[in-house]
Regions:
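Short beta-strand-centered segments at strand-helix junctions
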Residues: 176-193
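Cell wall/extracellular polymer interaction/catalysis modules
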Residues: 1-173, 190-224
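Acidic two-metal-ion nuclease catalytic site recognized across multiple nuclease folds
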Residues: 227
Length: 227
């Protein structure tokens, strides 16, 4: 486990500065981080405000962290899951041809989210930056509820990857579980839906985010123009 405390905005530091600088460092090398579009930084392997990271497992928990950036507003931090809930599912794809379907975990990277359904429960569709619905993933080939290095090495893809309500979804919701989709509570998704129909989504592992956070210089003054 890794000390996760550097991730969280310390007293006296403006959240826009702290989380915005982390996002900027994590965006580097992919595309310049836009300041005029809503963005989500999804951090896998650390629960919101947790002191330590944790092993990523296929369980029905919002034990990852999301940070929504909207121009003109402070960052909105929310609990989410960037992993599946189940170890197997008949609805999943058989990634290794052994006759047993394998749930998927989206690989870290940069994606586009498009709001496909707004009411009654918001749903976003994942796409690559090139516009493909074929999303890079790892699959739990041995069905032990986690991705090991052997599974990580296999370059696989998944389709129909969404961001939707999860295990605490209201009765009647079409989505309550996940075999590859990202999930969050209805309240969080309603906030995200107000940000706009198109959102850029940067997914990183917790250890990578923590290293970026350690490079952030605390700044007690808010910026002149909040972005």
């Amino acid at each position: 486990m890794t000390d996760a405390r550097p991730l969280w905005c310390p007293p006296g530091t403006h959240p826009v500065n702290h989380y915005g600088m982390i996002l900027g460092k994590l965006w580097g090398g992919l595309l310049p981080p836009p300041t005029d579009k809503p963005r989500i930084l999804a951090i896998r392997g650390v629960a919101l405000f947790a002191e330590e990271t944790h092993e990523v497992l296929s369980v029905p928990k919002y034990d990852d962290t999301g940070v929504l950036f909207v121009p003109g507003a402070e960052p909105f931090l929310f609990p989410m899951a960037t992993h599946p809930y189940q170890k197997d599912s008949r609805a999943a794809t058989d990634g290794n041809g052994d006759g047993v379907p394998d749930v998927a975990t989206v690989r870290t990277g940069l994606y586009r989210l498009t709001l496909a359904i707004e009411k009654p429960y918001p749903v976003w569709v994942f796409a690559t930056m090139a516009g493909s619905a074929s999303i890079p993933c790892s699959r739990d080939l041995n069905h032990d509820g986690k991705i090991d290095w052997r599974e990580q090495e296999k370059q696989l893809t998944a389709t129909a990857i969404l961001l939707h309500v999860g295990h605490d979804a209201p009765a009647g919701s079409e989505h309550r579980s996940s075999i590859g989709c990202a999930t969050a509570s209805l309240r969080s998704l309603e906030v995200i839906a107000r940000a706009g129909r198109q959102i850029l989504y940067r997914l990183v592992d917790a250890d990578v985010a923590i290293e970026a956070a350690k490079l952030v210089t605390p700044d007690t003054l808010p910026p002149e123009n909040v972005t």
